[in-house]
C-alpha cells in the first residue's frame, strides 16, 4: 500500500481510484537537464561495452541518473507479431530503442504518439547485439543470457512510462533504403528504427546450414520446461510456404529471406523477415521466388549466443507493410 501511494504521486498515470482525464505529458513536466536523446542513452551503455563487441553480449548497464528520453511510437503489437515490446524513435538523434513492456501495447500507445520514459532504475541490456531498455535482470534471467527484463506489472509501467500527445508518423520518421544506397545509408546506428526497404528481392535457397523459407518447430518432451528446436522446410513438409507456421493449435516462427544481392544471409544487403505463428498474417503465402517489392519494418540484429552467425532481421508491424 505504501508503494502504491508513493507511485500515485510520482508515476505517469492517473489514480485509478479517482479517475480523471488522462494526463498528456510534455517536456514542461521535466527539468531541461533531465531530457537526453535516445542516442545519448545508448552511449551510456557503449561507454562500457563498445558497439559490436562480443564482450557486451548478455550484459547490462543500470541507469543511475534521473534521465528522461522521449520518442515517437513506431511499433504496434495489434497484428500479433511484435511481442511484449514497444519501439520508440527520436528524430533529434535519429535513433530508436526497444522498451521491454507487456502485451496489448497498441491499446495504450499509438503509432506516432510521443512517449516519455523515466529511465532511472532501469537497465540497458544487450541481447544478441540489440540494445533494449527494461528492468535489471534477475539471476535466472542472466543464466538464460537475458540482459534485462520486462516491466512486468502496472506499477512499474506507471512509474516509468509517461504517455504524451498523439501524433502521426512522417517521412522524417522512416529511413528509406533502396538497391542503390543500402551499402552506404544503412548501418548499426539504425538498429531499432523503422526502415522502408524498397526494391527487395525474395529469395529461396540455402545459406550455410539454413534453408529458406523455413519454420522452427518447438517440442517440449516428457514434461520438460525447455523446448527442443528443429528448423523445418515448408516444401519438405509438403506445406505451402507462408510467413509462419500456424496449424492444429501449433504456432512456430517462420523465416523468409529478402535480398539486395549476394549469396548468403550474412552478406550485406540480406535480411530475414521473422514472423510469429501467433501473428494474424502467419498463413499469408510468401511471394514467388525472384519477386521484388517493398517492406517497412523495425530493423534488428541477431546472432548466436557467442556472437557469431550474425543476421539482420526485419520485424514487421502489419501485413500491410509488406508490398509484393
What do the PLM-derived regions correspond to, one by one?
Residues 1-2:
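Sec-dependent signal peptide recognition
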Residues 7-11:
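C-terminal motif of bacterial Sec signal peptides marking the signal peptidase cleavage site
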Residues 13-83, 87-324:
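OB-fold nucleic-acid-binding modules
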